[in-house]
């Protein structure tokens, strides 16, 4: 995996980028900047990192991101693998599943991993690779920007004040974002007034539903969520309608036991490790960018926890933004590229809010009866649509990149997720695009088109040497010893990318999306797409 040299300590006072917030969104942003040689500094007002967390699901699209970064195996080795969700409605056999085995790729499941542990893995990777650490107990007091740049006033852990002038700021500081407040950006939406969620990590004896699925137990006026966590504990969440609103842990355990027993009269809760409660919001920032300051994660959007997508979408915000800031900062990409962060990610957040609200109404539509909620889970197409949305695999940027798509081609379009394909033993497409820079994938359909494919590859390599070329010859071709030439040995590239009679090429982004795709006879479309993104070689 190619990386740039690091020219400055990650947390130097004169770092190019200030990241406010030390959670998963901020940590992914730091990774994307540092691996491209852009210095950054991360601050968080908390005195230490979180030791507990509410989020515990890493979905398929995020696992592909973790693979791209190089740390997916750590989550697989120590996480709990869940097949998906069960919806168990009270007093009926009309139950439903969201079975994640239908998903494409290497991660057709949910990885259960506490957010605080997810953060720990990311922090350790940043420290080991870049000697980078968040600055805990450091608070953003004020943030201003004008024609002279950005001014950020900080209070350090020892109480002293410091003023810095980063060129960029990423606000990943949660639902009560100080960055968003300083920018004067509205956070519009509503609260789910009827829903206070209460959560507990606790051992369970004789839990009959099993550990291979995440379980929703749904009654007309209540619900219980249960999933196995790494180690011996389970995560249990209930809707709080007053009965579980207790002040001490033992009373809380008794209330949880009562809720769980109404669905499973054999399961018994042990002494809880910890418990918490929170109110559910549905809100979204009216803008993700103001000048050189950006919002990401919960600072930009929050929603019902139904489906467990929140942490995942926040990390994907950072994965979309980090490489763009880095390439603009380095003079490799045009500044207009940064406008695409808002235009690409706000529709995703809107879909997220709508999708989580729909699932929220099934799980926590208290007082609305079960019949309509059950019918929603039986509707044609509901299973696959919900599974792809919750996993993050359905989100795309087709509308934003439609002008860079050749609609004659079968298979994925510009704006879609990059489909993986095994090209040869121990060589997968994902291995070839694990770069800090864009990749040009050129795929002639026949040996007769190889010369034309090489001509397009060489043209783009000459004008944009930053782009990594990968040429994949059709199945049956002789193996090549060239480093950037491969063979579709098993025909998987053809199956995953469409059975096209003519060859094609695609510009693949560092965040695992297709930026442009066109037939070999439309090389001008590829040139136009690259020219819109990158600075030409002088």
UniProtKB/Swiss-Prot annotation:
Triggers of expression: By polychlorinated phenols.
Per the UniProt entry, the disulfide pairs are: none
The record's annotation in Gene3D superfamilies points to: 3.30.70.2450, 3.40.30.120, FAD/NAD(P)-binding domain
Name the top EC class: oxidoreductase
A Gene Ontology biological process noted in the UniProt record is:
pentachlorophenol catabolic process
Q: How does it assemble?
A: Homodimer.
Q: What Gene Ontology terms describe what this protein does at the molecular function level?
A: FAD binding; pentachlorophenol monooxygenase activity
What this chain does, per the record? Dechlorination of pentachlorophenol to tetrachlorobenzoquinone. Also removes hydrogen and nitro, amino, and cyano groups from benzene ring at the para position in relation to the hydroxyl of phenol.
Q: Which gene encodes it?
A: pcpB
Q: What is this protein called?
A: Pentachlorophenol 4-monooxygenase
Q: What is its EC number?
A: 1.14.13.50
Q: Which UniProt keywords apply?
A: Aromatic hydrocarbons catabolism, FAD, Flavoprotein, Monooxygenase, NADP, Oxidoreductase
The protein's required cofactor(s) are namely:
FAD
- Which positions are annotated as binding FAD? 16-45, 288-298
Q: Which domain of life is it from?
A: Bacteria
Protein family: Belongs to the PheA/TfdB FAD monooxygenase family.
Reactions catalysed, as given in the entry: pentachlorophenol + NADPH + O2 + H(+) = 2,3,5,6-tetrachloro-1,4-benzoquinone + chloride + NADP(+) + H2O; 2,3,5,6-tetrachlorophenol + NADPH + O2 = 2,3,5,6-tetrachlorohydroquinone + NADP(+) + H2O
Pfam families per the UniProt record, alphabetical: FAD_binding_3
Cross-referenced InterPro entries:
FAD-bd, FAD/NAD-bd_sf, RIFMO-like
Q: In which pathway does it act?
A: Xenobiotic degradation; pentachlorophenol degradation
């Amino acid at each position: 995996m190619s990386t740039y040299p690091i020219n400055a300590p990650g947390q130097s006072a004169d770092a190019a980028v200030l990241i406010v917030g030390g959670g998963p969104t901020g940590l992914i942003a730091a990774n994307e900047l540092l691996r491209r040689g852009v210095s950054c500094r991360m601050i968080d007002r908390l005195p230490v990192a979180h030791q507990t967390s509410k989020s515990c699901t890493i979905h398929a699209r995020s696992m592909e991101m973790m693979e791209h970064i190089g740390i997916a195996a750590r989550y697989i080795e120590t996480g709990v693998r869940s097949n998906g969700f069960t919806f168990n409605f009270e007093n009926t056999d009309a139950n439903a599943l969201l079975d994640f085995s239908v998903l494409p790729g290497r991660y057709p499941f949910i990885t259960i991993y506490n957010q605080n542990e997810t953060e720990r893995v990311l922090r350790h990777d940043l420290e080991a690779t870049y000697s980078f650490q968040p600055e805990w107990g450091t608070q953003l007091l004020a943030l201003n920007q004008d024609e002279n740049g950005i001014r950020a006033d900080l209070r350090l852990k020892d109480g002293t004040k410091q003023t810095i002038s980063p060129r960029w700021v990423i606000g990943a500081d949660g639902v009560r974002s100080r960055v968003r407040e300083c920018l004067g950006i509205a956070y519009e939406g509503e609260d789910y007034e009827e829903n206070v969620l209460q959560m507990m990590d606790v051992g369970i004896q004789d839990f009959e539903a099993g550990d291979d699925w995440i379980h929703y137990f749904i009654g007309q006026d209540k619900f219980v969520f249960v999933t196995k966590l790494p180690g011996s504990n389970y995560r249990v969440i209930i809707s709080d309608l007053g009965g579980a609103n207790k002040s001490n842990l033992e009373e809380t355990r008794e209330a949880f036991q009562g809720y769980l027993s109404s669905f499973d009269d054999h399961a018994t809760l042990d002494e809880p490790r910890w418990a918490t409660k929170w109110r559910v919001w549905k809100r979204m920032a009216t803008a993700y960018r103001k000048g050189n300051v950006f919002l990401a994660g919960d600072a930009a959007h929050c929603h019902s926890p139904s489906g467990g997508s929140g942490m995942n979408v926040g990390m994907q915000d950072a994965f979309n933004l980090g490489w763009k800031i880095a390439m603009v900062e380095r003079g490799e990409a045009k500044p207009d590229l940064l406008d695409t962060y808002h235009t690409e990610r706000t529709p995703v957040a809107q879909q997220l809010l709508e999708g989580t609200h729909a699932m929220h109404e099934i799980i926590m539509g208290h007082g609305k009866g079960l019949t309509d909620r059950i019918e929603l889970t039986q509707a044609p197409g509901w299973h696959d649509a919900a599974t792809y949305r919750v996993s993050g695999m359905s989100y795309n940027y087709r509308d934003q990149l439609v002008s860079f798509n050749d609609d004659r081609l079968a298979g994925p379009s510009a704006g879609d997720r990059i489909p993986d394909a095994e090209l040869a033993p121990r060589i997968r497409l994902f291995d070839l695009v694990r770069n800090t820079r864009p990749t040009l994938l050129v795929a002639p359909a026949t040996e007769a088109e190889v010369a034309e494919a090489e001509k397009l590859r060489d043209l783009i390599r000459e004008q944009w040497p930053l782009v990594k070329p990968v040429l994949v010859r059709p199945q049956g071709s002789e193996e090549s010893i060239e480093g950037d030439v491969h063979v579709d040995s098993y025909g998987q590239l053809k199956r995953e990318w469409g059975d096209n009679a003519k060859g094609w090429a695609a510009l693949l982004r560092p965040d695992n999306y297709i930026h442009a795709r066109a037939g070999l006879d439309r090389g001008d479309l590829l040139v136009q797409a690259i020219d819109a993104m990158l600075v030409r070689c002088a």
